[in-house]
Amino acid sequence: MRYFRIIVTKGDDSKLSKLNISTTVSGDIIVTHLIGKIKTDDVYEWFNGFEQVCQQFISEGRKYKLLVDRKGYTPDHFSVQKAWKDKFFNETILNHSKAIAFLLEEGEILNYLQQSNTKESVKFFDDYEQTLVWLNGYPI
C-alpha cells in the first residue's frame, strides 16, 4: 500500500513582486516604492534613498507630495513593518509633505484605512492612475 503526502501551502511565491525600493521625483511629487519580499535591511536601504530625495526638497524650502507605492509589499518578518513605520513616520519628512497617497493591494486593510482615515491630505488607493490624478489635483 502506498501513501501520498499532500502539502498545502498558502500563496504562491512565484507571484511575489520583484524587489523595488527606489525613489524618484516627478515635478513636486516624490514617488517611493517599497515592493517585493522586503527584509529589514531593504527598509534601511530604501529609507536612505527616500530621505535624500526629501531632504533635497526641504533644503530648498520646497513642499512636496508623496506617492508611497506598497502594492506588492510583503514583509519577510513582523519586524520589517515596525522598521518601516519607525523610518517613514519621521516628523521632519511628514511636516514638509502637503499630501500623501498610499498605493496598496486591494483588500480588507485598504478598505479599513480608507474608511477610518480622517485626514484630508492623506488618501489610500489600489489604482496607480487614480493615485496620480488625486496627487496632481492636490494644491501645493
Question: Residue spans of the language-model regions?
Answer:
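Amphipathic, Lys/Arg-enriched alpha-helical "gate/interface" segment within cytosolic domains
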Residues: 2-140
